[in-house]
Amino acid sequence: MSAQQQKNLSESAQVDQQSVQPFPRSQKVYVQGSRPDIRVPMREISLDVTPTDFGGEINAPVTVYDTSGPYTDPNVTIDVRKGLSDVRSAWIEDRGDTEKLPGLSSEFGQRRLNDAELSAMRFAHVRNPRRARAGHNVSQMHYAKKGIITPEMEFVAIRENMKLAEAREAGLLNEQHAGHSFGASIPKEITPEFVRSEVARGRAIIPANINHVELEPMIIGRNFLVKINGNIGNSALGSSIEEEVAKLTWGIRWGSDTVMDLSTGKHIHETREWIIRNSPVPIGTVPIYQALEKVGGIAEDLTWELFRDTLIEQAEQGVDYFTIHAGVLLRYVPLTAKRVTGIVSRGGSIMAKWCLAHHKENFLYTHFEDICEIMKAYDVSFSLGDGLRPGSIADANDAAQFGELETLGELTKIAWKHDVQCMIEGPGHVPMQLIKENMDKQLECCDEAPFYTLGPLTTDIAPGYDHITSGIGAAMIGWFGCAMLCYVTPKEHLGLPNKDDVKTGIITYKIAAHAADLAKGHPGAQIRDNALSKARFEFRWEDQFNLGLDPDTARAFHDETLPKDSAKVAHFCSMCGPKFCSMKITQEVRDYAKEQRIDAVDLDAEQGMQAKAAEFKAQGSQLYQKV
């Protein structure tokens, strides 16, 4: 995008048209809570009737979790220049513990606002920020500890259940394998009280800054559905504000539960405002990235005062969680010297360099309680960064990684003392046999605070395919108890991801998260699998496509060899053809048995006898065989 186009963004910005298309045979449904303004969005997939001898068997619609916000609702007009509608202001105002500020508090925010050259690119509909009244704490954890069920908690409970009671009544929960949850306590139904208790205990967080009023609340915790995060952000090498907003809307269409804005290039402040105002999902950032930009990229010049102003700037915009690398301590840095890949975290390397340059302890660590004071005034959640995570499987589970993890556990308890919500970031690159140890160590050190991992990548030999190497580890650690998985795209280690890469990474991680939910035995997790399997056996091709995580790709693959509409009702696919389709043959056997009134058990027994007879003849009809 040219400088002139970027300059006129406030007039020209348009929503990404691909992101606002409703999914095929799907409709947006809203489940109302205890008050009219609690309207929880879900996606309902309609299914075709199964033909029978008696007119047809109705297949109940399948309800699925929906992260796309109003973008896929055809009844909503989207204008990214105005942002999304307000969801939460009434809830926040009703609590009576916040105040509207006359303007921005941060010095940097004020300077950007007064810079006339930025006026055309600036988001035009900025509200005055809100902050806790003096002496008040406005975090969801604070309310939860006081026994208060907030509208956000009720919203989350309804959302996690996905009409579970209706599914149970319809008998859709009868066919699900028992899971193994490794100590997680997943109830048969998620209630608002259960949400409150998990947030109060620190086992779950609801990232929901009071200045992100467009947010549709969600929850991150091991006793809830496994979530995924997608990363976006510009850099000095390119990408525009409009492209980043398009990546946001594209990512949440395919299932990104949260989005991190990792921008490091120009106009970080303006980019973030556009993203938050158009985001129905929580937005996370790494504030040290912007702080570094403010000092010209020289880590040694960072100061606590500058960083504090950056936290306030971002909190007043509405960032829901901050990655803070407060566990990178001076004494841990030498432990990385003999690593194959050293320190690979950007935030970790920045703070390590600062510590060595000044030979002082990490100022994020020494000022941690000061940071807590800011967080609880806006309800920003901690995502305690793993600045010493392994960047290769050779470095996995070493002294530096686990030393930092122990420190993150100490910091978690300090955050909880201030009633600040907190999750813990994890690796990284870990071979499969060491993944369980990571999860167990985190649960032990951090007292079950939610774990949030990047993968982990299980091997280092597949550049271009690291969405797969990491998807393997993500599924495993999600099963073991990890609450949120940060996606990896095919471009990992190679370049900045484009829209296609974002989609590939998200779909890969939706598979991993869902596989983990199945393995944990999350109630209702298997409903969609069962519906798709039934559609596959009955050759309901459109239902197969629409029930999948990516209907577009499934339909395109089918149409590569069978493009005609008539193929959408064919009782075979292009892999086996009409004569060798196992499911078609099975249906014919069933039909034959029905016509001949042969019991299925008898038919199976007869087929087994015939198979054994053929095996006996093939071995030479000898009564005894040599061994």
UniProtKB/Swiss-Prot annotation:
It catalyses: 5-amino-1-(5-phospho-beta-D-ribosyl)imidazole + S-adenosyl-L-methionine = 4-amino-2-methyl-5-(phosphooxymethyl)pyrimidine + CO + 5'-deoxyadenosine + formate + L-methionine + 3 H(+). GO terms for cellular component: cytosol. One of its GO terms (molecular function) is zinc ion binding. [4Fe-4S] cluster binds at residues 573, 576, 581. One of its GO terms (biological process) is thiamine diphosphate biosynthetic process. Binds 1 [4Fe-4S] cluster per subunit. The cluster is coordinated with 3 cysteines and an exchangeable S-adenosyl-L-methionine. Zn(2+) binds at residues 429, 493. Gene3D superfamilies: 6.10.250.620, Radical SAM ThiC family, central domain. Pathway: Cofactor biosynthesis; thiamine diphosphate biosynthesis. Substrate binds at residues 231, 260, 289, 325, 345-347, 386-389, 425, 452. Residues 1-32 are annotated as: Disordered. It holds the Pfam family ThiC_Rad_SAM. Its cofactor is [4Fe-4S] cluster. Its EC number is 4.1.99.17. The keyword Transmembrane helix does not apply. Keywords: 4Fe-4S, Iron, Iron-sulfur, Lyase, Metal-binding, S-adenosyl-L-methionine, Thiamine biosynthesis, Zinc. The keyword Magnesium does not apply. Belongs to the ThiC family. Homodimer. HAMAP family: ThiC. This is Phosphomethylpyrimidine synthase. It comes from Ectopseudomonas mendocina (strain ymp). The lineage of its organism: Bacteria, Pseudomonadati, Pseudomonadota, Gammaproteobacteria, Pseudomonadales. The gene is thiC.
